[in-house]
């Protein structure tokens, strides 16, 4: 039986590899239609880095600092094994962790019938995290 972690990771990989075959244009994603909210703890520098990354991609970002993100993770039914240091809400989707733009872009263009996507942990070289992906 496939567990939810495997399913979500497979979904992220699928998004990353097939984003060139999408119908919506990049301008539709970046024209300000997507207001996003990032829930994070006040002291997390990498979370702030992800906010800056989203703003560079022309998203309108609202930051909500919280001492504990447990209630947000619970509200959006994010499995414990898929949780990361911050949760972003984009329309009807959650984006958990340092998910690359290609995956976010594909999610918003295709609008699949899922709750969200996740990249658990804090992988080196992902948006908001220092280092190169090759490390």
Question: What are the language-model segments listed below?
Answer:
Residues 8-18:
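Bacterial N-terminal signal peptides
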Residues 39-41, 64-66, 98, 120-122:
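Active-site-proximal beta-strand/loop segments in catalytic clefts of secreted hydrolases
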